[in-house]
Amino acid sequence: MTIGLSVTNDVFARDILTVAQLNQAVGQLLERSIPSLWVRGEISNFTQAASGHWYFTLKDSRAAVRTVMFRSRAAQVGFVPRPGDQVEVRARVSLYEPRGDYQLQADGMRRAGVGNLYEAFLRLKAQLQDEGLFDPQRKRQPARLPRAIGVVTSLHAAALRDVLSALARRAPQVPVIIYPAPVQGADAAARLAARVAQANQRAEVDTLLLVRGGGSIEDLWSFNDEALAREVAASDIPVISGVGHETDFTIVDFVADLRAPTPTAAAELACVPRGDLLAALRHTAERLARAQQRRLDQAAQRLDRAAAMLTSPAQRLAHQQERLNTLRHRLASAWRGPQGRRVARLDMLAQRLAHRRPDTGRAAERSAALLAQLGRAQARLAAARQARLDTLAAQLRALDPQHTLARGYAIVRDAAGAIVTDATRLAARDRIEIAVARGRIGADVTDIGTPDGTDGNPALRRG
């Protein structure tokens, strides 16, 4: 790197400088002229002060430079370096004026080689994205009510304890199957991929959690493996990834069906809390009860309307009888009224004609025959109307509940007054009322039977 230094400070135009003035001017020159840069070297003389600041020397085979990293920046590094560690430090060049020593003021640190790892991460991410493995349309929602939940992680990982604790708290009724595999190391990625494939082959879970706790980029590198990513993408079981902390992203997070910021969050996404399920069941039961009650109310209204049409068959019969009597009276009045007078006049005229014409006798006979036919026709009409009235009366009597009771039947009502049509609705010692043709009977239930001869439902009996 070539850095051009331009000294324009008026301080250097003076004839004589104090040591403090010189160090201050050199410090300002260094800070203004050299930008923030990355420096690779080996950690030595590392000290973590009580204040939280880090002091160490960064060296290689030919040179060394003192370095300081203040607490706020050190807290953002995912590891505590040790002497001998190869690291890459992002820093600004500054001067420690009291001693005139130049130093590095670091604001970032990573293990040496992380830059290469990150470049490999970006290359694989771009490749899989171009293949469509990150496409949201190919991702599936985990089952809302899983039969069982699978967990792929190390048996010794703290993440496993967190997941099991969250699942036991939220969904204790859901079985959990663990597919153990190391989460870091040379063969970790291959063994994790094998466990994902095994879970799909066994098909015993509805949701698969792939989890591990936080760590450095090297610790999480198994989850950036291409073979593991492709196995997760090809999984028939929805996969929820929960790798590291919220700020950590791995290739597996992009191909998984759902990404959780932590292992605990992955467990929470995998199941609905038991309390929410119970509340939903109660709500559904209430809706069913209301719907059933509406149907019962509608049926009761239809029954009431039907009963209103048959409230008093005897009254309808009396009305028809009254109408028949009226017709009989009108028929009798007709014979006593103008029609009777016409018949009498006809008889008189017939007698007079009989004396005046020789054929009046035959006319009288024909007239008498016609009168007889008229009488028979009127009698048949009256008989037909009487038969029709008798038929209607018989039909009305058949619909009269009192008529049914008179044939030996009875109506049974429970303590609430509802008619009992199903014996299994009652229980032993229930109070009932029995209506018969003449009166009512109060009774207590002693035994219950069903139409097939078996005893009633034992669950409805009282001990």
From Swiss-Prot:
Subcellular location, record wording: Cytoplasm
Presence of keyword Cytoplasm: yes
Enzyme Commission code(s) on record: 3.1.11.6
GO molecular function: exodeoxyribonuclease VII activity; nucleic acid binding
GO cellular component: cytoplasm; exodeoxyribonuclease VII complex
InterPro entries: Exonuc_VII_L, Exonuc_VII_lsu_C, OB-fold_nuc-bd_dom
GO biological process, one term: DNA catabolic process
Catalytic reaction annotation: Exonucleolytic cleavage in either 5'- to 3'- or 3'- to 5'-direction to yield nucleoside 5'-phosphates
Alphabetical keyword list: Cytoplasm, Exonuclease, Hydrolase, Nuclease
Enzyme class: hydrolase
Listed PANTHER family: EXODEOXYRIBONUCLEASE 7 LARGE SUBUNIT
Assembly, per entry: Heterooligomer composed of large and small subunits.
Family: Belongs to the XseA family.
HAMAP family for this protein: Exonuc_7_L (MF_00378)
Purpose: Bidirectionally degrades single-stranded DNA into large acid-insoluble oligonucleotides, which are then degraded further into small acid-soluble oligonucleotides.
Full protein name: Exodeoxyribonuclease 7 large subunit
